[in-house]
Amino acid sequence: MKMIDKIAADLCLDRDYIFSVVKRSQFYYRDYYIYKRDGGKRQISQPSSELKTLQYWVKNNILSKLPISSSAYAYQKGASIKKHAYFHKNSKYIFHTDICNFFPSISYEHLQPILQDNSKLFENLNIDFDSVETVRDICYRENKLCIGAVSSPIISNIIMYKFDVLMLDYCKKNGLKYSRYADDIYLSSCSYIDRSHVCFLSSLLNKFGFRINTKKTYFSSPKYRRKVTGLVIGTDYSVTIGTEKRKLIKKLVYDKLIHNKGDSNSILGYLAFLKDIEPHTYNNIIAKYSQYCTEDIIEALSK
């Protein structure tokens, strides 16, 4: 059967209605912009509830069955920036770069051959493979992945699978650790990371249709602050949130409890983040500022 018929049957929705959403999917997005750290803007394209439902179906029934590398630390169950940082924490030298314009650079031509190689999936779902382009219509907009679509993160990991495997194999042969967190790529080692390794990485990325973002490329060592996905690795190889964020959290808690200034949800989010990365610091803050409360500090902040 056609994929649209399968989706209609599984979701108990009218087939013609789904057909209409799929064929006009480009118009089922709401666009808005958020500011980036460098002052630029990032477009977010939020799919409507109708299209999002179809994207979830594709994600759960097709995309989730495709291989993803263990070197990919984002968008997976159980993944976290903490686990990612701990993977590199014992390395003396760290190299970081990111991929230019990552999601919008991922076209359907990246995904189509992978779906072709896994055509058995469609057979198991009793779906005619000749209707595979319905995946494109549901998950892509103008042949690009959208930041905001529920299917985009997993597709990005899927299409990077072969790249991750090749990079991991190369790094193992050269005494390096390799990981990727979305569009952030890290190499680390206990010895100096030669630029030839970076050249290999850049060349391989180019073969997959991507480019290194030179503005966000850097080397770090114990002489300089080493950071992995926002977390700081100390000279004692501990993983922390860093002095600046620690001071910020203390100030936010103080201002809220003493002057009733600040957003409670934001502060609670910061505290949850701190508790996960630095539980001892979290406990110290709770103990210190509890003197200003006659009730549990978390309950006080929740009001």
Where are these regions (language model features)?
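Right-hand nucleic-acid polymerase module
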Residues: M1-Y35, K41-A149, I158-Y161, V165, ...
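Long, hydrophobic, amphipathic alpha-helical segments used as structural scaffolds
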Residues: L66, S70, C171-Y178
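Catalytic palm active-site di-aspartate
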Residues: H96-C100, G148, S152, K173-S189
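"…together with the soluble PPM/PP2C metallo-phosphatase catalytic core" -> "…together
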Residues: I155
